[in-house]
Curated annotation (Swiss-Prot):
It comes from Streptococcus gordonii (strain Challis / ATCC 35105 / BCRC 15272 / CH1 / DL1 / V288). Involved in the biosynthesis of ADP-glucose, a building block required for the elongation reactions to produce glycogen. Catalyzes the reaction between ATP and alpha-D-glucose 1-phosphate (G1P) to produce pyrophosphate and ADP-Glc. It comes from the Bacteria. It is an enzyme of class 2 (transferase). Its EC number is 2.7.7.27. This is Glucose-1-phosphate adenylyltransferase. Homotetramer. Belongs to the bacterial/plant glucose-1-phosphate adenylyltransferase family. Transmembrane segments: none annotated.
């Protein structure tokens, strides 16, 4: 039976710009907003868009990500005709091959895609924060009779050189594409979200592999090839909230924006929920000493200090006289008595010892996964 569209989430990135936060886990598994992981947004968009089959392509440090996704039940992807599959590099008759780029990861999973037999494939990045109706994008793809549709976002001209930039005609047909140009001619930036007619993409990737032609990356190789070949390539304009959280500063900034109850992400919209795998935790405890202002405090937290404009993730602890300001405290982290934390991201399971002062005013301060700061070695 032919399925209309299969979603493939590229979730194998190492995320080196996030430093300590991704030393032990893949970037899409990094926590966000107190109760989510970054990949939850792409998975939830799929669920809300009525996409029943999702493949998650992993590579770097996949354990936490695999555990988080499980059988997909948190996103309703565990039914009879639905499913989520974890796709990792594997050994084939030609030998072991790591994914060499975004489109190479798709080529390496042709057998899986063929088993789903989709008419269209939706390619997504697993490390962006946004809400989007992919069904609306698919309808645009059909209306334009496109071979490829690229989701685009208007960005400030000064930031355009960080993205793949498209020039379009009056009908939004893409006539030129430049990957991270020094002098961009447009401000229409690729969001790394693509809809392809599967058979056309499949044929191109197979021919390129047999001919030893480099087609390993969508931005550098595939999109330019489509344009040169005269394929119908269209832009789908997106005007909602979208955040690339690939740096410490952008991740911190997105979390701070999320605190606002009227945030641009519209997090309280019940018609487009963001789902996640949430373990059952005890209720929060706020002592008589606790002072919490303009903050998000998730289940299982213990607060005996002061928290201002910050996020406390599941099971975080803030001991007596500790002060947290403009910071993200991830799950299970412990902030010791009298510690002072300002403009920082404290990783999962980290311990900040009594009296330690962290000030990220000049540059957001990061404490890594299970890292201990100020803890004597004999107590380590």
């Amino acid at each position: 039976m032919k399925n209309e569209m299969l979603a493939l989430i590229l979730a194998g990135g190492q995320g080196t710009r996030l430093g300590k936060l991704t030393q032990s886990i893949a970037k899409p598994a990094v926590q966000f907003g107190g109760r989510y992981r970054i990949i939850d947004f792409a998975l939830s968009n799929c669920a809300n868009s009525g996409i029943h089959n999702v493949g998650v392509i992993t590579q770097y440090q996949p354990l936490a990500l695999n555990s988080h996704i499980g059988n997909g039940s948190s996103w309703g992807l565990d039914g009879i005709n639905t499913g989520v599959s974890i796709l990792q590099p594997y050994s084939a008759s030609e030998g072991n091959r790591w994914f060499e780029g975004t489109s190479h990861a798709i080529f390496q999973n042709i057998d899986y895609i063929d088993s789903i037999n989709p008419e269209y494939v939706l390619i997504l990045s697993g490390d962006h924060i946004y809400k989007m109706d992919y069904d609306d994008m698919l309808q645009s793809h059909k209306d334009n009779n496109a071979s490829l549709t690229v989701a685009v976002l208007d960005v400030p001209l000064k930031e355009a050189s960080r993205f793949g930039i498209m020039n379009t005609d009056a009908n939004n047909r893409i006539v030129e594409f430049e990957e991270k140009p020094e002098n961009p001619k447009s401000t229409k930036a690729s969001m790394g979200i693509y809809i392809f007619d599967w058979q056309r993409l499949r044929n191109m990737l197979v021919v390129a592999e047999k001919s030893n032609v480099d087609m390993s990356d969508f931005g550098k190789n595939v999109i330019p090839n489509y344009l040169e070949s005269g394929e119908s390539v269209y832009a789908y304009e997106f005007a909602g909230y979208w955040k690339d959280v690939g740096t410490v500063e952008s991740l911190w900034e997105a979390n701070m924006e999320y605190i606002n109850p009227e945030n641009a992400l519209d997090s309280r919209n019940r018609r487009w929920k963001i789902y996640s795998r949430n373990l059952i935790s005890p209720p929060n405890f706020l002592s008589e000493n606790a002072k919490v202002e303009d903050s998000l405090v998730v289940d299982g937290c213990f607060v005996d200090g002061t928290v201002k404009h910050s996020i406390l993730s599941t099971g975080a602890q803030v001991r007596k006289d500790a002060v947290i300001e403009d910071s993200v405290i991830m799950s299970g982290a412990i902030i010791g008595q009298g510690a002072k934390i300002k403009r920082a991201i404290i990783g999962e399971g980290a311990i900040i010892a009594e009296g330690v002062e962290i000030d990220g005013t000049e540059e957001v301060f990061v404490v890594g996964y299970n890292e201990k700061v100020g803890v004597p070695k004999d107590e380590d």
